[in-house]
Amino acid sequence: MASVVASAAVVTPFAASAASTTKSSQIVSVQAGLKAGVFGGKSEWQTKTQTNGSRVSCMQVWEPYNNLKFETLSYLPPLSQDALAKQIDYVIKSGWAPCIEFDVQGTVTREGSTMPGYYDGRYWTMWKLPMFGCTDSASVLREIEECKKLYGKKCYIRCLGFDNTRQVQCASFIVHQPTL
Protein backbone atom coordinates (compact mmCIF):
# COMPACT_ATOMS: atom_id res chain seq x y z
CA MET A 1 0.00 0.00 0.00
CA ALA A 2 2.80 2.44 0.88
CA SER A 3 4.63 1.69 -2.37
CA VAL A 4 1.48 2.40 -4.40
CA VAL A 5 0.92 5.71 -2.63
CA ALA A 6 4.57 6.70 -3.07
CA SER A 7 4.56 5.80 -6.76
CA ALA A 8 1.26 7.64 -7.29
CA ALA A 9 2.75 10.82 -5.86
CA VAL A 10 5.65 10.75 -8.32
CA VAL A 11 3.89 9.72 -11.55
CA THR A 12 1.64 11.70 -13.84
CA PRO A 13 -2.03 12.25 -13.02
CA PHE A 14 -3.06 9.64 -15.63
CA ALA A 15 -0.89 6.98 -13.97
CA ALA A 16 -2.09 8.06 -10.52
CA SER A 17 -5.72 7.65 -11.51
CA ALA A 18 -4.99 4.23 -13.00
CA ALA A 19 -3.22 3.18 -9.80
CA SER A 20 -6.02 4.52 -7.60
CA THR A 21 -8.76 2.76 -9.58
CA THR A 22 -6.87 -0.50 -9.34
CA LYS A 23 -6.43 -0.05 -5.61
CA SER A 24 -9.98 1.16 -4.99
CA SER A 25 -11.42 -1.94 -6.64
CA GLN A 26 -9.25 -4.06 -4.38
CA ILE A 27 -10.30 -2.07 -1.33
CA VAL A 28 -13.98 -2.37 -2.24
CA SER A 29 -13.63 -6.12 -2.52
CA VAL A 30 -11.98 -6.25 0.90
CA GLN A 31 -14.66 -4.06 2.52
CA ALA A 32 -17.46 -6.04 0.92
CA GLY A 33 -17.23 -8.45 3.88
CA LEU A 34 -18.10 -5.66 6.37
CA LYS A 35 -21.87 -5.79 6.07
CA ALA A 36 -24.24 -5.08 8.91
CA GLY A 37 -26.65 -7.86 9.68
CA VAL A 38 -24.41 -10.74 8.64
CA PHE A 39 -24.94 -12.37 12.01
CA GLY A 40 -28.30 -13.74 13.09
CA GLY A 41 -30.73 -11.73 15.17
CA LYS A 42 -30.33 -8.44 13.30
CA SER A 43 -33.44 -6.81 14.73
CA GLU A 44 -32.51 -7.78 18.29
CA TRP A 45 -28.96 -6.51 17.77
CA GLN A 46 -30.20 -3.17 16.42
CA THR A 47 -32.55 -2.60 19.34
CA LYS A 48 -29.73 -3.04 21.87
CA THR A 49 -27.01 -1.10 20.06
CA GLN A 50 -26.35 2.33 18.66
CA THR A 51 -24.44 3.19 15.53
CA ASN A 52 -21.41 5.44 15.70
CA GLY A 53 -22.63 7.55 12.76
CA SER A 54 -19.92 6.57 10.33
CA ARG A 55 -20.32 4.68 7.08
CA VAL A 56 -19.00 1.48 8.65
CA SER A 57 -22.21 0.31 10.25
CA CYS A 58 -20.79 -2.88 11.75
CA MET A 59 -19.04 -0.92 14.53
CA GLN A 60 -21.69 -0.33 17.15
CA VAL A 61 -21.82 0.46 20.86
CA TRP A 62 -23.59 -1.84 23.31
CA GLU A 63 -26.59 -0.12 24.92
CA PRO A 64 -25.76 0.26 28.65
CA TYR A 65 -29.30 1.05 29.91
CA ASN A 66 -31.65 -1.74 30.98
CA ASN A 67 -29.13 -4.26 29.73
CA LEU A 68 -27.03 -5.15 32.78
CA LYS A 69 -23.90 -7.22 32.37
CA PHE A 70 -21.96 -8.18 35.45
CA GLU A 71 -18.70 -10.07 35.24
CA THR A 72 -16.25 -11.57 32.79
CA LEU A 73 -18.47 -14.27 31.32
CA SER A 74 -21.81 -12.45 31.58
CA TYR A 75 -22.05 -11.87 27.82
CA LEU A 76 -22.27 -15.63 27.30
CA PRO A 77 -25.34 -17.76 27.90
CA PRO A 78 -25.55 -19.21 31.43
CA LEU A 79 -22.75 -21.71 32.00
CA SER A 80 -23.55 -25.40 32.34
CA GLN A 81 -22.26 -27.39 35.31
CA ASP A 82 -19.43 -28.77 33.15
CA ALA A 83 -18.42 -25.29 32.00
CA LEU A 84 -18.51 -24.02 35.60
CA ALA A 85 -16.35 -26.96 36.68
CA LYS A 86 -13.80 -26.14 33.97
CA GLN A 87 -13.66 -22.47 35.02
CA ILE A 88 -13.22 -23.46 38.67
CA ASP A 89 -10.54 -26.00 37.69
CA TYR A 90 -8.69 -23.17 35.93
CA VAL A 91 -8.88 -21.06 39.10
CA ILE A 92 -7.52 -23.95 41.18
CA LYS A 93 -4.75 -24.85 38.69
CA SER A 94 -3.65 -21.20 38.67
CA GLY A 95 -3.01 -21.45 42.40
CA TRP A 96 -5.87 -19.15 43.38
CA ALA A 97 -8.29 -19.79 46.22
CA PRO A 98 -11.92 -20.10 45.10
CA CYS A 99 -14.30 -17.79 46.98
CA ILE A 100 -18.08 -17.62 46.73
CA GLU A 101 -19.90 -14.32 47.20
CA PHE A 102 -23.52 -13.20 46.90
CA ASP A 103 -25.31 -9.87 46.61
CA VAL A 104 -28.89 -8.69 46.14
CA GLN A 105 -28.12 -5.87 43.72
CA GLY A 106 -25.16 -7.35 41.85
CA THR A 107 -24.00 -4.10 40.23
CA VAL A 108 -21.64 -1.29 41.11
CA THR A 109 -23.47 1.96 41.87
CA ARG A 110 -22.75 5.35 43.42
CA GLU A 111 -25.53 5.96 45.93
CA GLY A 112 -23.87 6.25 49.36
CA SER A 113 -21.37 8.95 48.47
CA THR A 114 -20.28 11.10 45.55
CA MET A 115 -16.61 11.14 46.55
CA PRO A 116 -14.17 10.18 43.78
CA GLY A 117 -13.20 6.53 43.98
CA TYR A 118 -16.17 5.54 46.16
CA TYR A 119 -18.60 3.02 44.74
CA ASP A 120 -21.33 0.97 46.39
CA GLY A 121 -21.65 -2.66 45.38
CA ARG A 122 -17.98 -3.49 44.88
CA TYR A 123 -17.91 -5.66 47.97
CA TRP A 124 -20.30 -8.57 48.09
CA THR A 125 -21.13 -10.74 51.10
CA MET A 126 -18.75 -13.69 51.31
CA TRP A 127 -20.21 -17.18 51.56
CA LYS A 128 -18.28 -18.86 54.39
CA LEU A 129 -14.48 -18.52 54.08
CA PRO A 130 -12.25 -18.63 51.00
CA MET A 131 -11.54 -22.22 50.04
CA PHE A 132 -7.77 -22.22 50.61
CA GLY A 133 -6.25 -25.60 49.82
CA CYS A 134 -9.16 -26.69 47.63
CA THR A 135 -8.02 -29.20 45.01
CA ASP A 136 -11.21 -30.11 43.14
CA SER A 137 -14.07 -28.21 41.56
CA ALA A 138 -16.71 -30.60 42.94
CA SER A 139 -16.39 -29.19 46.46
CA VAL A 140 -16.74 -25.63 45.13
CA LEU A 141 -19.81 -26.64 43.11
CA ARG A 142 -21.35 -28.17 46.26
CA GLU A 143 -20.85 -24.88 48.12
CA ILE A 144 -22.39 -22.96 45.21
CA GLU A 145 -25.46 -25.23 45.29
CA GLU A 146 -25.74 -24.75 49.06
CA CYS A 147 -25.57 -20.98 48.60
CA LYS A 148 -28.22 -21.19 45.85
CA LYS A 149 -30.60 -23.00 48.22
CA LEU A 150 -30.47 -20.16 50.75
CA TYR A 151 -30.03 -17.06 48.59
CA GLY A 152 -30.65 -18.14 44.99
CA LYS A 153 -34.16 -16.68 44.70
CA LYS A 154 -33.11 -13.10 45.42
CA CYS A 155 -29.31 -12.86 45.07
CA TYR A 156 -26.60 -12.95 42.45
CA ILE A 157 -23.86 -15.47 43.21
CA ARG A 158 -20.32 -15.24 41.87
CA CYS A 159 -17.13 -17.24 42.16
CA LEU A 160 -13.78 -15.50 42.63
CA GLY A 161 -10.22 -16.61 42.18
CA PHE A 162 -8.16 -14.98 44.95
CA ASP A 163 -4.35 -14.92 44.80
CA ASN A 164 -3.23 -14.93 48.43
CA THR A 165 0.43 -14.13 47.66
CA ARG A 166 -0.36 -10.93 45.76
CA GLN A 167 -3.53 -10.25 47.81
CA VAL A 168 -5.64 -9.57 44.72
CA GLN A 169 -8.72 -10.94 43.01
CA CYS A 170 -7.59 -12.49 39.72
CA ALA A 171 -10.82 -13.96 38.35
CA SER A 172 -14.51 -13.40 38.92
CA PHE A 173 -17.60 -14.74 37.18
CA ILE A 174 -21.31 -14.98 37.87
CA VAL A 175 -22.49 -18.51 38.58
CA HIS A 176 -26.16 -17.72 39.34
CA GLN A 177 -28.60 -14.89 38.61
CA PRO A 178 -31.87 -14.54 40.51
CA THR A 179 -35.17 -15.03 38.78
CA LEU A 180 -36.61 -11.55 38.37
Curated annotation (Swiss-Prot):
<comment type="function">
    <text>RuBisCO catalyzes two reactions: the carboxylation of D-ribulose 1,5-bisphosphate, the primary event in carbon dioxide fixation, as well as the oxidative fragmentation of the pentose substrate. Both reactions occur simultaneously and in competition at the same active site. Although the small subunit is not catalytic it is essential for maximal activity.</text>
</comment>
<dbReference type="InterPro" id="IPR000894">
    <property type="entry name" value="RuBisCO_ssu_dom"/>
</dbReference>
<feature type="transit peptide" description="Chloroplast">
    <location>
        <begin position="1"/>
        <end position="57"/>
    </location>
</feature>
<protein>
    <recommendedName>
        <fullName>Ribulose bisphosphate carboxylase small subunit, chloroplastic</fullName>
    </recommendedName>
</protein>
<dbReference type="GO" id="GO:0016984">
    <property type="term" value="F:ribulose-bisphosphate carboxylase activity"/>
</dbReference>
<keyword id="KW-0934">Plastid</keyword>
<dbReference type="Pfam" id="PF00101">
    <property type="entry name" value="RuBisCO_small"/>
</dbReference>
<comment type="subunit">
    <text>Heterohexadecamer of 8 large and 8 small subunits.</text>
</comment>
<keyword id="KW-0809">Transit peptide</keyword>
<keyword id="KW-0120">Carbon dioxide fixation</keyword>
<comment type="similarity">
    <text>Belongs to the RuBisCO small chain family.</text>
</comment>
<keyword id="KW-0602">Photosynthesis</keyword>
<keyword id="KW-0601">Photorespiration</keyword>
<dbReference type="InterPro" id="IPR024681">
    <property type="entry name" value="RuBisCO_ssu"/>
</dbReference>
<dbReference type="GO" id="GO:0009853">
    <property type="term" value="P:photorespiration"/>
</dbReference>
<dbReference type="GO" id="GO:0019253">
    <property type="term" value="P:reductive pentose-phosphate cycle"/>
</dbReference>
<keyword id="KW-0150">Chloroplast</keyword>
<dbReference type="GO" id="GO:0009507">
    <property type="term" value="C:chloroplast"/>
</dbReference>
<dbReference type="InterPro" id="IPR036385">
    <property type="entry name" value="RuBisCO_ssu_sf"/>
</dbReference>
<keyword id="KW-0113">Calvin cycle</keyword>
